[in-house]
C-alpha cells in the first residue's frame, strides 16, 4: 500500500472515531438532563404502601375526600385531593410532595394539620402521580402551578379564613418558588428544600466522585432539549422581597440536600423566618425521626404568627 493510501485510510479512521465521539458527546448532553429531570416516578399505590410501612395511614380511609383537577398557567392538569377535617373548619393547608413521589407522599404531614384544625389539600406535582408525564423544572413551572392551585383554593372554598403551604424537598422548593407570585397565603413551612438545584447536583456529583463539568453539560442539554436552564432553577431568588412568614426545617444528617440550603433561604427572606434542624434526621426524615419535635416547631411557629397578628 502506498504512503498516500495509508494516509487516506488513517484520516478515514480518525474521522470515523471523531464522528463516533461526537455522536456519543451529543447523546450524553441530551441524556444528562433526562436523567436529572425525568426520574422514575412512583405510582399512587407504591407511594401509599411506602407511607403505610413507615407511618400510620389508617386515618386516610376515615376522611371525607374530594378529587378534582386544577389547570396550571399553561393548561397542564394537576390532580388534587381535598381531605376534610372531621371537625368543620375554614382553615386550609396545601401540602406539596417531593421528587418522584406523589400526593400520597404528603400523607405523613396530614395528621399534624388535622390536629391543628386544617383541611388538607394534597396534589400531584407536574410529571408525578396521575398527571401526564413531563419533565421537572425544579420549581420554575411547579411554582406557577402551585400559585394556580392557591388561586383555585380561594375561589373554590369561599369560606376560607386561613391558608398555609407546606412542602417537602422538591415540594419545599416549589412552595418557596411560588412566593415569587405574591400569593395570598398566611404561612409557609419548607422542609428540606433546596435553594438552587445546581448546588445540589454539584454536591451530589462531588460525593459520587463524578466530574463536576457534567453539571454544565446537563445545563446545556436542558437548554437544548427542554428550553430551561438548570442554573436558573433558584427558588431562593423568590425570597428577596417576600413578606410571608416561613418556617424552614431540615434534617441535620441530610446529605442529599444540605441543611445550609434552608439556612441560606432563612437568611435571604425579607419576611419573618425561623430555621430549625432535626437531630439524627436524613433527607425528608424529620417528621419520622422526631415527630414530637417537628410538631413542636410547627405549632410554635403558627402560634407565633397568630400572636403577631393579634
Where are these regions (language model features)?
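An N-terminal hydrophobic leader/cap segment in hydrolases
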Residues: 14-17, 21-71, 81
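Hydrolase active-site cap/lid region
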Residues: 42, 177-228
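The serine-hydrolase catalytic nucleophile loop
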Residues: 99-112, 125
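Short alpha-helix in the alpha/beta-hydrolase fold that links the catalytic acid
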Residues: 109, 244, 258-267
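Conserved alpha/beta-hydrolase
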Residues: 113-132
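Alpha/beta-hydrolase active-site loop
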Residues: 136-157
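Short beta-strand/loop motif that positions the catalytic acidic residue
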Residues: 241-243, 248-250, 254
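Catalytic histidine-centered segment of alpha/beta-hydrolase-like enzymes
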Residues: 281-292
